[in-house]
From Swiss-Prot:
Subcellular location: Secreted, Cell wall; Membrane
Signal peptide per UniProt: 1-29
Disulphide bridges, residue numbers: 32-62, 63-72, 310-332, 334-341
Lineage: Eukaryota, Viridiplantae, Streptophyta, Embryophyta, Tracheophyta
Modifications after synthesis and translation: Asn-303 is not glycosylated.
Keywords: Cell wall, Disulfide bond, Glycoprotein, Leucine-rich repeat, Membrane, Plant defense, Repeat, Secreted, Signal
Pfam families xref list: LRR_1 (PF00560), LRRNT_2 (PF08263)
Primary role: Inhibitor of fungal polygalacturonase. It is an important factor for plant resistance to phytopathogenic fungi. Inhibits all polygalacturonases (PG) tested, with the exception of PG from F.oxysporum which was only inhibited at 60%.
SUPFAM superfamilies according to UniProt: L domain-like (SSF52058)
Family membership: Belongs to the polygalacturonase-inhibiting protein family.
Known glycosylation sites: 64, 141, 303
Ranges for the LRR repeats: 82-107, 108-132, 133-156, 157-180, 181-205, 206-228, 229-252, 253-275, 276-299, 300-319
Name by which UniProt lists this protein: Polygalacturonase inhibitor 2
Length: 342
């Protein structure tokens, strides 16, 4: 058999060519858009290169599911970064929300949460994310007011800014967002009155939770136009009439208004047949308990304690299944499970 001896110099040249070809093949096969990768690496830098993002490496593909919290659009096969989860980052010192987020124009979902060292206001750069549907900034020390510029992101479906250090007043302009389904602003320092415009959210809007803030004034009469499945305005300083939140023609499932100074005749409100949770404790609500409560077969949570209610607790439904504490400390409420009326 004839043998061929390849010179050493030729063998070395072939090895170099092979390495180059493999490198070119790898580069060509990378799905991550180079602009998206550059933006992500800048975000990492702007946050002080936290060790939690150690998987974000310039030599790897950001769309191969090895980059923590990063997902790309595989449905349309554009492979643009459309989902970013920045939760639980161990930032080495306080940092603001990076304005470089604006360089991810295809983001549909942005979650920023559980970061004690995240501080400062919500940056105007967020308004450039014109395809954003879901925006979560929660359990951080982000401060300042909820910005008006959010009304520019017409695609927004969900806004969750719960448990931060946000202050100022509620921005009236977000009620113009045509696709907004719900807002969650619990656990901040938001003050002032609820804007009248919040009664003009679109028919898609079904959830409003703004508990544990410093809201004052009255619930706008325009809320009669809303059909909320979930409403939680508890632990504020609201006063006056909250009957506009009730109605037999609504699809309301939960109403939580505890620990305010609300005063209205509970006996005159209509009740949604879907109501499963009602927390009205620690207010100034008067009148009687509506007979309609006995017809609510889904009602599993009720607390009307520490109000000015009177009369006999209606018999039937689930009302006698609740503990005495659910009815305690009213003006003259009586009947099972409280002592009998005299």
């Amino acid at each position: 058999m004839t043998q061929f001896n390849i010179p050493v110099t030729m063998s070395s040249s072939l090895s170099i060519i092979l390495v180059i070809l493999v490198s070119l093949s790898t580069a060509h096969s990378e799905l991550c858009n180079p602009q998206d990768k550059q933006a992500l690496l800048q975000i990492k830098k702007d946050l002080g290169n936290p060790t939690t993002l150690s998987s974000w490496l310039p030599t790897t593909d950001c769309c191969n599911r090895t980059w923590l919290g990063v997902l790309c659009d595989t449905d349309t096969q554009t492979y643009r970064v459309n989902n970013l989860d920045l939760s639980g980052l161990n930032l080495p010192k306080p940092y603001p929300i990076p304005s470089s987020l604006a360089n991810l124009p295809y983001l549909n979902f942005l979650y920023i949460g559980g970061i004690n060292n995240l501080v400062g206001p919500i940056p105007p750069a967020i308004a450039k994310l014109t395809q954003l549907h879901y925006l979560y900034i929660t359990h951080t020390n982000v401060s300042g007011a909820i910005p008006d510029f959010l009304s520019q992101i017409k695609t927004l479906v969900t806004l969750d800014f719960s448990y931060n250090a946000l202050s100022g007043t509620l921005p009236p302009s977000i009620s113009s967002l045509p696709n907004l389904v719900g807002i969650t602003f619990d656990g901040n320092r938001i003050s002032g009155a609820i804007p009248d415009s919040y009664g003009s959210f679109s028919k898609l809007f079904t959830s409003m939770t703004i508990s544990r803030n410093r809201l004052t004034g009255k619930i706008p009469p325009t809320f009669a136009n809303l059909n909320l499945a979930f409403v939680d305005l508890s632990r504020n300083m609201l006063e006056g009439d909250a009957s506009v939140l009730f109605g037999s023609d609504k699809n309301t499932q939960k109403i939580h208004l505890a620990k305010n100074s609300l005063a209205f005749d509970l006996g005159k409100v209509g009740l949604s047949k879907n109501l499963n949770g009602l927390d009205l404790r620690n207010n100034r609500i008067y009148g009687t308990l509506p007979q309609g409560l006995t017809q609510l077969k889904f009602l599993h949570s009720l607390n009307v304690s520490f109000n000015n209610l009177c009369g006999e607790i209606p018999q039937g439904g689930n009302l006698q299944r609740f503990d005495v504490s659910a009815y305690a400390n009213n003006k003259c409420l009586c009947g099972s499970p409280l002592p009998a009326c005299t």
